[in-house]
């Protein structure tokens, strides 16, 4: 990811774009392309607002966003290779049974790992809240 992503919230990081209030434009996090709020953008013969245009741009130009983040932020994420692969399968919409068959494990093992990811996400959310409280002191 480009520099400065630390100031963005988790929704902005996940969707891959944010609104720059100073420049009055939507910005793609991956390539920093700007979509001026006052402009109308053409995609595939249709016209879109800047926000919709940056969404379409993100899907078309950066469809591998999850994989890219998993690769580039290995140190921060602290995930094993198998965990990264599981997350990519979850994102692709594969069922627990399909994933289990591919990995040669039981579906309950996959369900347990999904549970572990949810617990880790809850922990991260609470950690962020605590850190914000500490910084406000």
Task: Specify the residue positions occupied by each region the protein language model found.
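Short, basic, alpha-helical segments at the C-terminal edge of helix-turn-helix-like DNA-binding modules
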Residues: 126-137
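Short helix-coil-helix linker/hinge
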Residues: 77-83
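Residue-level signal for the short linker/turn that defines the boundary of a DNA-recognition helix
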Residues: 81, 94-95
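Amphipathic alpha-helical segment used for protein-protein interaction
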Residues: 63-77
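DNA major-groove recognition helices of helix-turn-helix
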Residues: 110-124
């Amino acid at each position: 990811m480009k520099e400065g992503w630390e100031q963005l919230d988790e929704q902005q990081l996940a969707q891959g774009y944010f609104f720059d209030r100073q420049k009055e434009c939507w910005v793609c996090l991956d390539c920093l392309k700007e979509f001026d709020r006052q402009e109308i953008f053409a995609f595939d013969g249709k016209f879109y607002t800047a926000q919709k245009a940056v969404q379409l741009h993100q899907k078309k130009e950066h469809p591998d966003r999850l994989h890219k983040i998993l690769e580039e932020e290995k140190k921060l994420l602290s995930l094993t290779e198998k965990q990264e692969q599981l997350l990519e399968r979850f994102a692709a919409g594969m069922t627990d049974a399909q994933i289990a068959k591919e990995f040669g494990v039981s579906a309950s093992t996959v369900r347990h790992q999904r549970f572990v990811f949810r617990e880790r996400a809850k922990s991260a959310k609470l950690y962020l809240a605590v850190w914000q409280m500490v910084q406000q002191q």
